[in-house]
């Protein structure tokens, strides 16, 4: 990157100017300005020639329309005015993440676009294919986005702060649109990168929403305002903080290009491990890394084989735009998707509406799950969803208990109620145009596999306690511990487990995670101790049973069940990880994960169900942003009949130099930034809390009755005759085997396609050998 002025010292007194500008687009009353970029930025640009002036001018639009009426009210976008065909739209949504998280994502996107431009043999991509890609950044609230992020956007030419005004002719501005084709990138170390790093120009649309209206509203701007204007083929969704691999976006796009019936594709999300994998020293991060790996090796491949992935991760996923479009009658995937925004926005405004839609509001906490189901079950179509393992992206995972609980509360509640929704509406599959074979397998996945998984999830608390109770109860019959030694040890840990679970209910109902993080941490540690104790007792039981084998013992059946269960978990996990050439998490994270299983099973489940009244995304809506009616644009007709506006602003060159100074200051004093923000849940009304109580009571009593029934039927020391324990162990084995078979099927399918495509290329290129692994 060419050296940008380093000798600048900021001046406290800024130059204020007033000027009249002629509006360049839109209809009467729409403010669209062409503003020159700062002089210092123009000096370092390698490309300045363009018939549209896209490298030397930034377009600002004060959008007074709602997203659904964007085009109808005369608003448009640069790419449409230039007559360009858009193949991919890349949308980055953000709230108040820091500049390091934003730079990490944006620089990764620019490297992906550079890769598209480097594919000279492609029929679609090539040298100038950056013109086919539009990057859209949507910031959720002008008073919420961090100033440091705006400084990075200013440095790349994509933002000029002095242009944003809350009103135009007394009409409220709902979104500020800044459009610029940038040639500058800033990496996560806050260092400038340019064309000497083989980066290509990138068309950027920065949409700065005036009010904070949640992420789903940001997607409304994307899908209902911008996409109808751009009409892209594929839409890629990214969260700020996610670092896509250099080929991730191409690999996602290729899934759509290869199969015309693919409506959505999920990339592989990896936990950010840090330099030298330092983050794995945190057990919480290590357990999440293992969980993500299991999902990417076992769950996602199985679902992809069926054609229906229950959730496409918002951090890295893609959709075919034509598949998202509604039917002519207004029903369809997007209509169902945005119903969640209407429900949640009305939650605090209309109590009666809240009563009618409480369960739907919880369901739409996982609105992306609803979108996935609506795509696969879209009437008269045969869309499928695919997992693209070669499209990878790193994301920062919660590193504290409070952040972890807040994130998983929404995931668990949304997933549970969304699963009920898809099970209830599974008959919609018969209105699709899928083949009979596909419909059959979708029923197997959705109605059988998902139903069994849902039942196990619902009774996971009781299954955990009963497994702990019967496994540790085997000590009661051990004579080596004395006449009553085994009984008292069992009783002590049994009461400890009951006390911890009871405490979790109390603290989850009455406390926020950020206010009670030490209590939650203590309870998680105690649960881990219980799990460690149960693990030790299990091994003792296995060793003792083997030692007494053939002497008339009655524990052989349960012994076989335990061994099979262990092989189905540790064994199959290890085997599939090796087959996928990705075994390192088994060595670095498996111990942390298995010790954290009780916390995943109990702590997260209890906290989520005890907070079903909270139907927020974890951020408070900014319904009353700071407004100044005097700070607005006034549009008038001049003597020539043209529309013009008076602008009072500061010197953009001075502003730009000050921005560069601030970025360098942050770079020299750079601290490790996480990109997280504390999120305060909305207060629920009395009705929502009443329903929460009923849900928790029903769930708790159902699990309690099941526990009491099993405890009455089987004695703790009679492990050898315990059919329930054997059933649970075999059920775990069977479910793990099903996942492994599906994962293996996906692997075979992937390699088969790779070799078929390679053979076709060999025939065309003179038998050139394949140069890469299909999974990478």
Swiss-Prot record:
Induction: Under certain adverse conditions.
Compartments (UniProt record): Cell membrane
Record's catalysed reaction(s): [(1->4)-N-acetyl-beta-D-glucosaminyl](n) + UDP-N-acetyl-alpha-D-glucosamine = [(1->4)-N-acetyl-beta-D-glucosaminyl](n+1) + UDP + H(+)
The keyword Amino-acid biosynthesis belongs to this UniProt entry's keyword annotation: no
Pfam families in UniProt: Chitin_synth_1, Chitin_synth_1N
Keywords associated with the record: Cell membrane, Cell wall biogenesis/degradation, Glycosyltransferase, Membrane, Transferase, Transmembrane, Transmembrane helix
Gene Ontology terms, MF aspect: chitin synthase activity
Keyword Chaperone tagged: no
EC identifiers of the protein: 2.4.1.16
Principal location: membrane
Record entry for activity regulation: Requires proteolytic activation.
Protein name: Chitin synthase 1
Gene name for this UniProt entry: CHS1
């Amino acid at each position: 990157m060419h050296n940008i002025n380093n000798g600048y010292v900021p001046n406290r007194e800024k130059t204020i100017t007033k000027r009249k500008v002629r509006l360049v687009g839109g209809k009467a009353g729409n403010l669209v300005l062409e503003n020159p970029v700062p002089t210092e930025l123009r000096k370092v640009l390698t490309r300045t020639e363009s018939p549209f002036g896209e490298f030397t001018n930034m377009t600002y639009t004060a959008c007074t329309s709602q997203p659904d009426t964007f085009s109808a009210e005369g608003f448009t976008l640069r790419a449409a005015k230039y007559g360009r065909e858009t193949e991919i739209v890349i949308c980055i949504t953000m709230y108040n993440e820091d500049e390091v998280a934003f730079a990490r994502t944006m620089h990764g996107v620019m490297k992906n676009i550079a890769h598209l431009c480097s594919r000279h043999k492609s029929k679609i991509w090539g040298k100038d294919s950056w013109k086919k890609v539009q990057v859209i950044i949507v910031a959720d609230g002008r008073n919420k986005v961090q100033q440091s992020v705006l400084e990075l956007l200013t440095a790349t030419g994509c933002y000029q702060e002095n242009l944003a005004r809350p009103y135009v002719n007394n009409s409220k501005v709902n979104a500020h649109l800044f459009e610029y084709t940038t040639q500058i990138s800033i990496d996560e170390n806050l260092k400038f990168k340019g064309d000497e790093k083989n980066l290509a120009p990138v068309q950027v649309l920065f949409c700065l929403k005036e009010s904070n209206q949640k992420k789903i509203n940001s997607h409304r701007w994307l899908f209902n305002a911008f996409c109808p204007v751009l009409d892209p083929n594929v839409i890629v969704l990214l969260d700020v903080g996610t670092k896509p691999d250099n080929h991730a976006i191409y690999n996602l796009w290729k899934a759509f290009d290869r199969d015309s019936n693919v409506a959505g594709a999920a990339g592989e999300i990896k936990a950010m491990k840090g330099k030298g994998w330092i983050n794995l020293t945190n057990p919480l991060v290590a357990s999440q890394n293992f969980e993500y790996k299991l999902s990417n090796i076992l769950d996602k491949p199985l679902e992809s084989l069926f054609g229906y992935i229950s959730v496409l991760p918002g951090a890295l996923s893609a959709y075919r735009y034509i598949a998202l479009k509604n039917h002519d009658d207004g029903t369809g995937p997007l209509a169902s998707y945005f119903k969640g925004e209407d429900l949640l926005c009305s939650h605090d405004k209309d109590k009666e509406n809240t009563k009618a839609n409480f369960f739907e509001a919880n369901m739409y906490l996982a609105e992306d799950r609803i979108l996935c189901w609506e795509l696969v079950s879209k009437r008269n179509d045969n869309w499928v969803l695919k997992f693209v393992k070669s499209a990878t992206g790193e994301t920062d995972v919660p590193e504290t208990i409070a952040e972890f609980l807040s994130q998983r509360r929404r995931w668990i509640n949304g997933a549970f109620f969304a699963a009920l929704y898809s099970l209830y509406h599974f008959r919609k599959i018969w209105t699709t145009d899928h083949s009979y074979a596909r419909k059959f397998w979708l029923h197997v996945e959705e109605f059988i596999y998902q139903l069994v998984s849902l039942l196990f999830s619902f009774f996971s608390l009781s299954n955990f306690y009963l497994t702990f109770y019967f496994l540790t109860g085997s000590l009661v019959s051990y004579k080596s511990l004395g006449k009553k030694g085994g009984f008292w040890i069992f009783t002590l840990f049994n009461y400890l487990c009951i006390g911890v679970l009871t405490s979790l209910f109390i603290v989850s109902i009455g406390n926020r995670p950020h206010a009670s993080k030490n209590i939650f941490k203590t309870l998680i540690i105690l649960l881990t101790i219980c799990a460690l104790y149960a693990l030790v007792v299990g091994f003792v039981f296995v060793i003792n049973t083997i030692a007494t084998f053939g002497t008339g013992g009655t524990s052989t059946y349960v012994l076989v069940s335990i061994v099979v269960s262990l092989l189905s978990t540790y064994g199959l996990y290890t085997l599939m990880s090796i087959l996928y050439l990705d075994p390192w998490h088994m060595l670095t994270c498996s111990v942390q994960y298995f010790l954290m299983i009780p916390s995943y099973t109990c702590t997260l489940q209890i906290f989520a169900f005890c907070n079903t009244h909270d139907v927020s995304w974890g951020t408070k809506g900014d319904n009353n942003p700071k407004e100044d009616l005097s700070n607005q644009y006034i549009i008038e007709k001049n003597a020539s009949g043209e529309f013009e506006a008076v602008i009072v602003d500061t010197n953009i060159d001075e502003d730009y130099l000050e921005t560069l100074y601030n970025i360098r200051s942050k770079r020299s004093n750079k601290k490790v930034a996480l990109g997280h923000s504390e999120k305060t849940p909305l207060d629920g009304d009395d009705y929502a809390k009443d329903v929460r109580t009923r849900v928790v009571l029903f769930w708790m009593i159902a699990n309690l009755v099941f526990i009491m029934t099993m405890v009455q039927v089987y004695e703790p020391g009679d492990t050898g005759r315990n059919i329930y324990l054997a059933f649970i162990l075999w059920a775990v084995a069977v479910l793990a085997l099903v996942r492994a078979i599906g994962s293996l099927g996906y692997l075979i399918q992937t390699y088969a396609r790779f070799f078929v495509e390679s053979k076709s290329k060999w025939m065309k290129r003179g038998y050139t050998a394949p140069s890469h692994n299909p999974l990478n």
